[in-house]
Amino acid sequence: MSKYKVSVIIPVYGVEKYIGKCLDSLVNQTLKDIEIIVVNDGTKDNSQKIIDKYAKKYKNIKALIKENGGQGSARNYGLEHATGEYIGYVDGDDYVEYDMYEKLYNKAKENDLDVVICGNYNVSEDYKNKTTDLEFTKFDDNFINALLGKKAVWNKIYKRNIIGKTTFRSKVWYEDFDFSIKVLTNAKKIDYVNEPLYDYLIREGSTMNNSNVDRNLEILLAFDEIIKNKKYDKYREIIEFLAIDHIYISTIVRIIKANVSKDKKKEVIDKLINYMNNNFPNYEKNKYINSLSKNRKIIYNLIKNKKYKTIKLIFKIKKG
């Protein structure tokens, strides 16, 4: 018998400005039977002092400290200590709506679900602007929706036994993507509470804004593993679309926007396109391309025609 209904795991590194707001949103959840596992991943700031204050006041907070190993490693460590029936993840610079875990847990228990997914707010760093970002639900099959939708782990709860021995890769950018594909393809029952319940803070210091352009190639490791998986043939067309969406569009756009030389950009983009051609030679005929948003279809076609300067200009105008 699980001790708690939900265990929420929060990796902490360099978030002393934000961790108090994050913990406030968790200790005040309307679902009271919740375990809060805070993992200090060797942070050098004052986050631990803030965590200790909360841990003294709230008995359901489990404060753990480990050597720095990256966000994935911290999540794995937290999971080892979790006792909840369901598992959730929150990033230390984000926060959640006060009824998030009650709504997700109640939905899970209604139909004995393996995974429950919600929408989120995108929040500006000064907290002044919030925009709603609902989940992808274009298809009647929630399994397809989940695989084609957001690969973040923070807008979901997972039944503990569906995670099993699945772990996050350590010190890679795409740990959420890798973990999500593995767990979602193990799930039998998935559903949605499609309202914004998670508050995702968009800040310049976030991991994926790093200018080290070569690290974008780490996503290919995740796809290598997916292709080797015995379930690949069953989900081939979906995986191919994910490669279009994540390798061909998102990653190439990130490189185009990066502050590196033109030659370096070309080198990395060529590697990504070669990977697509070698592993998904018929990707241009994928039926799910039609499910791309209007803006992403435009970007897709610009990349196909190598109009990289136009893409950079679009994002420059959008930013400013």
Region locations from a protein language model:
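Catalytic core of nucleotide-sugar-dependent glycosyltransferases
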Residues: 197-203, 210-235, 249-250, 254, ...
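A conserved acidic beta->alpha catalytic loop
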Residues: 25, 40-49, 91
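N-proximal low-complexity "stem/linker" segments adjacent to membrane-targeting elements
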Residues: 1-27
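Donor-binding/catalytic cores of nucleotide-activated saccharide
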Residues: 71-72, 92-192, 201-214
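Membrane-interface aromatic/basic loop that binds lipid-linked glycans or pyrophosphate carriers
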Residues: 260-320
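Short aromatic/hydrophobic "clamp" motif used to bind/position activated sugar donors
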Residues: 87
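Glycine-rich, basic loop-to-helix element that forms the pyrophosphate-binding segment
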Residues: 66-82
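Short loop->beta transition adjacent to catalytic acidic/histidine clusters or analogous donor-positioning motifs
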Residues: 3-6, 27-38, 46, 58-62
